[in-house]
Structure formats: C-alpha cells, structure tokens
Amino acid sequence: QVSLKYPEGKMYSFGL
C-alpha cells in the first residue's frame, strides 16, 4: 500500500 500526502491536507492511499 502506498500513501501520498498532498499539501491540501488530504491523504490518498492505494494498493499497487
């Protein structure tokens, strides 16, 4: 699972 943090304060997580 990869989690990406964006400056917007939202966190997106998706599995590769």
From Swiss-Prot:
Record bears the keyword Magnesium: no
Modification(s) after translation: Position 16 could be leucine amide or isoleucine amide.
Keyword Cell cycle: no
Localisation: Secreted
Main localisation: secreted
Keywords: Amidation, Neuropeptide, Pyrrolidone carboxylic acid, Secreted
Pyrrolidone carboxylic acid: residues carrying this PTM: 1
Residue(s) carrying Leucine amide: 16
GO biological process: neuropeptide signaling pathway
GO cellular component term, pick one: extracellular region
Cysteine pairings via disulfide bonds: none
Domain of life: Eukaryota
Described purpose of this protein according to its UniProt entry: May act as a neurotransmitter or neuromodulator.
Family the entry assigns: Belongs to the allatostatin family.
Protein name: Allatostatin-3
